[in-house]
Design a protein with these regions (language model features):
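Short alpha-helical "recognition helix" segments of helix-turn-helix
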Residues: 205-207
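Acidic, Mg2+-coordinating catalytic module of metal-dependent nucleases/exonucleases
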Residues: 99-111, 115-116, 144-203
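Non-catalytic pre-domain segments flanking phosphatase-related domains
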Residues: 1-16, 222-227, 252-258
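Short helix-start
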Residues: 227-258
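Short alpha-helix plus adjacent loop in nuclease-associated cores
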Residues: 130-146
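Conserved non-catalytic scaffold segment of RNase H-like nuclease domains
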Residues: 1-113, 124-125
Length: 263
């Protein structure tokens, strides 16, 4: 999306009820792992938190020691919890309401879909009703060294006692969304577009805006003297959104001029 499209989308979302979800799992891949804890929080900027509920779930598979160390959730804890089929039916109406929101939504959404597939229930939400606070934080907070939820909790001094438990993480995600969406509501278009322009994009994301392959985009950005920053051990290039969109607009103008000349 271009900055103007993002501005329209986030202004719309800021007036919606958010259904914030977090899951803790036995692993990283939905196809081979199960959810062991879920929390859902519903809230809006207008009226604050409406509802929150949390459940441990017995996955009927082992909880790896590394997951227990990471989350604090042990095999003994989930052994006493209800089975998945007794939990997910209750959560389905909640998860179908409002704008589905999570920090790294693709992770949680993938697990939600997988768990409902185990019950032969389809679960999908349109893109217009999804909000990922990682993506929003990258857009609004481009200069922070990390957009991980624990680091953002620390940066903003949110009153969250623990991380990597579903209830605490949904609250942290809500506080982050509330903060950033309030800024989107209150700041002018010009101020927000200037902020958006400072976002650092991967080559893949820059290529998507330009409508090119990554190889074509790299060459086009180099020809336009757009200088990337190089990050990480592998010196991966990143480009500022403002530079990429300026090149996009220049290409659009050039294409329109070519069409006029053809006539």
């Amino acid at each position: 999306m271009l900055s103007t499209d993002l501005l329209f989308f986030y202004r719309q979302v800021s007036h919606q009820v958010l259904t914030v979800v977090d899951v803790e799992t036995t692993g990283h891949q939905p196809d081979s792992s199960r959810v062991i804890e879920i929390s859902v929080l519903q809230a809006s900027l207008e009226s604050g938190i409406h509802h929150q509920q949390t459940h441990l779930i017995n996955p009927q598979v082992p909880v790896p020691p590394s997951i227990t160390q990471f989350t604090g959730i042990s095999q003994e804890m989930v052994a006493q919890a209800p089975l998945a089929e007794d939990v997910w039916q209750d959560y389905l109406p909640l998860l179908n309401m409002g704008t589905l929101t999570a920090h790294n939504l693709s992770f949680d959404y993938g697990f939600l879909q997988s768990e409902f597939r185990h019950l032969d229930i389809g679960f999908t939400r349109p893109n217009s009703e999804q909000l990922c606070t990682v993506i929003l934080a990258r857009l609004m907070l481009p200069d922070l060294p990390s957009r991980s939820l624990p680091n953002l909790v620390q940066h903003f001094d949110f009153p969250i006692a623990t991380s990597h438990r579903a209830e605490a993480d949904t609250l942290a995600c809500w506080l982050l969304a509330k903060l950033l969406l309030t800024e989107i509501q209150n700041e002018s278009d010009e101020t927000l577009l200037d902020r958006f322009a400072k976002q650092w994009l991967s080559l893949r994301d820059a290529a998507a805006i330009l409508g090119m392959s990554t190889q074509q985009a790299r060459a086009a950005l180099k020809r336009s003297h757009v200088k990337p920053r190089l990050v990480g051990q592998y010196r991966t290039p990143q480009y500022q959104r403002g530079d990429v969109e300026q090149l996009f607009r220049a290409n659009q103008s050039s294409n329109q001029l070519s069409l006029l000349q053809d006539f």
